[in-house]
Amino acid sequence: MNILAFESSCDETAVAVVRDGRQVLSDAILSQADMHALYGGVVPEIASRKHVQAIAALTDQVLTDAGLTKRDIDAVAVTYAPGLIGAVLVGVSFAKSAAYALGVPLIPVHHVRGHIAANYLAFPELEPPFVALAISGGNTLLVDVRDYADMTVLGATRDDAAGECFDKAARVLGLPYPGGKPMDELAQQSAGGKYELPRAHVAGAELDMSFSGLKTAVVNLAHNAQQKGEALDAPALARDFACAVSGELVPRAMRALELTGRTTLVAAGGVAANSVIRADLERACAKAGARLFLPPLRWCGDNGAMIGAQGYYEYLAGRTASLDLNAYATMDLGTLE
């Protein structure tokens, strides 16, 4: 089954063709990061307009790269939530038009479900059930994946997403947007241990997380040092910040394995590319005797192939949409439209 897939939830326009949920025939991504870096973050209106300009050409490109014609497409999948509403709407509108023109089913895909499914592209042996740690710029979740299209949220951030905090910390340290990779590179220059940063505890919800206090602490450290004319050890702060984020994520992920009785942990999302978090997950899973799947870096960020992968399994589960499908800025992972 050849699925033409679209992802436009933030600042990447991504289109792919995926066969049977596992084989990527072609994929293309147009990033707007350099443009949004001028503003220190994503400007929703600009993102939406750039999606409109790029999506048709990328669609032609992936079909050509895959050696397919439009008649070879069996279904269309698209991210319909969550994300920047204008950006998501561009992808949904184009996907609906494509499905109608081709006379094929339209498959709605939750963005975070797509991130989790990116691992299916890299690991043919991976099958549910497992626990997923989905960490990105807009979402931070622990998910019980009972089956390919049957998932429940076990824990989530109560405020900021982990990736959002990395971007904010990078900005106060004078690093470019997006901040995840520059922060990681800076952190490799220090062993850390210099700055004591707060760790949150959410009463009554042991798998929930909070990153707003950590973000505020880093901002205050940087501003106070500037006001006092003191030198800030940026590499040490970047390292200690990454360790603090990892300290929120990894113990909760391991606890989720205990509570569910699962023996496999899957990481997903852009923040899963962070070297400190990856190393901590590897150590924790080795100690617990759990299997760990870390996505290759190419599948950590937003891409169309992950939507095609999850779209296949949503289709097998009977989840298709009519042409009145809408776009949503927010949506729970387990209670889809």
Regions inferred by a protein language model and the residue ranges of each:
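Short Gly/Thr/Asp-enriched flexible loops that form oxyanion-binding sites at enzyme active sites
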Residues: 78-102, 275-283
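Conserved phosphate-binding catalytic cores of ATP/NTP-utilizing and phosphoryl-transfer enzymes
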Residues: 1, 109-131, 310
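A contiguous, well-structured pocket-lining segment that forms one wall/lid of small-molecule binding clefts
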Residues: 185-265, 274-288, 315, 335
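Conserved phosphate-binding/catalytic loops in two-lobed NTP-binding clefts
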Residues: 108-109, 282-307
